[in-house]
Amino acid sequence: MIKVIGAAAAVHSLRCPPPVARLTPLKATTLDKLDASTAVDDDDVWNGAYREADWEATYNSLPADALAEPTTVPVEGTVPASLRGGVLYRCSPANFDRGGTRYKHVLDGDGFMLRVAFGQDGTKATVTGRYVETAPYVEETTKDEILYRNTFGTQPTGGPLRNAFTVTLKNVANTNVVSWGGRLLALWEAGAPHELDAVTLETRGEATDLCRGPPAGRKCTRGVTIDGGLIDEALGFGESFTAHPHVDGDRLVAFTWAQQPQRGEMNLKFREINGDWTDAVPPVSHAMPDCALAPHDCGLTEHYHVVVENRASIQMAPFVLGLKGPAQVLEIATKEGARCHLIPRAGSGLTAPVVVEIPPFFCIHVGDAWEDGDGRVHVVTSAWDLRDPTHFPPDLDTVPFLGAWSGPAPDFKRIPPSLLFETVVDPATGTLVSHENPRPVRGLCLEHPHVDGSGKVWASLANDRGISSPPSGYACYDLKTGSVERWYAGPRKFCEELVVAPKGEGEEGVWLLALIYDAATDATSVNVFDGDRISAGPVAVAPLPHAVPHGLHGCFQPRDGPMSA
């Protein structure tokens, strides 16, 4: 529950959560029941028990023709009226091997776009899916060989002799999707978007008009810039487009980013885009000195773009010499506080950014941000607590970035629990008011939070033991009342991120759409929940014709009106 702090106390009162106690993962007392797919005792539902083989099965490579033909499937229950005629899009890594070689990291997987179109009568859905046919994907598929270096360590065979001084990375187009202004874009935050046909999912090419850099088809290194002109053109440098744009009414708000190594700073440029892809207001630029890691996500309030800067260091030599991928040479700075940047929006009447330090934590996703009646900015994030001694030893100043995600599937025995944080900043005084893992959700392992105007947070829920495990259900946390509502998917099931879709005109609340994989049947389904009654379970379920790998992000394009995510 939000605690309002008086203005006089705001400068002096700082609430921070205590360091997470050392938690030992519980023994999987329910594993025999998981094997049998039988009922699990209530006390064991949220203990995080799972079979590693089940979890690894969610990262089996998907054959290219698995969903190539549109297939109409029956819906159990009824699709709500406001969703009928609309389309759920979901982007994800889906191919994890090439030429008999398994990729080093699931996030290096080739991007796959899923399309689920709901029928007008609410009883059927039509499913199709297709790989994003980037130029590297087509080339590697044709030769059945890994030909490009990847962000998280997958590299062509041949070692340094082949890979040294090759700094161009494969755009895997595997992270998110946006449907806006008649364009469907597959996003990957270290490159340019790829535009797809909204119905057939055929790849049309790179959307290089959205981020400055070399023209489509030319090999380039994005996320780096020197002069923004002739030098960049000669070296093939350019901007990257975020994988996390946000919708604000009739505008799509997004940013591009690029490191400027000679200045040692990260440069962001925010755009607010109309439905015809023109700028609603002039772009806003912002520099972050001494920043090694580009923001993965951002928030938006009436007056500010909100960015949480994670503190990290990078050792470029192993990457340049062809020994490691760029993510492998990143180290999280566990002793340094994060930085919250409040960047004035164009037309806000404000000019000076506000930058406030936050106690050490690592922000993963921004659920939402808003301004209260006193002008303070609230930011809800999912994050790792860097003071957790289980995963961040106190005697180490740095730890590897996403190292435990390598292998056939993310290894939750070595991944920190994702917790919900609420951070409050007073831009008038430039101070941090509070930063906490709110008590009602303390101990809940939550990820992919979404917040709406009613003050409710919906998120994937893994367990209530403060440990790390795959998502096995969903939670709704009411910021105003502190109440928490939960829903458990059942044994051997794994839940993807929720996609939030507003209810129809004249209705309050939201519908929640999610993919859930059942290891017992090796099947994936699309589930629709009422955001006001998530504990009641799905109101509609559409089985997919083929199981799909565990996905990342998606969006919903209604029959009429702008998309939601």
Give the label of every model feature segment:
Residues 12-14, 20, 58, 444:
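Residue-level detector of alpha-helical hydrophobic segments embedded in or interacting with membranes
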Residues 29-565:
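Beta-propeller domains
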Residues 21, 25-29:
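N-terminal mitochondrial targeting presequences
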Residues 15-17, 23, 351:
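Selective for proline/serine-rich intrinsically disordered segments
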Residues 1-16:
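N-terminal chloroplast transit peptides
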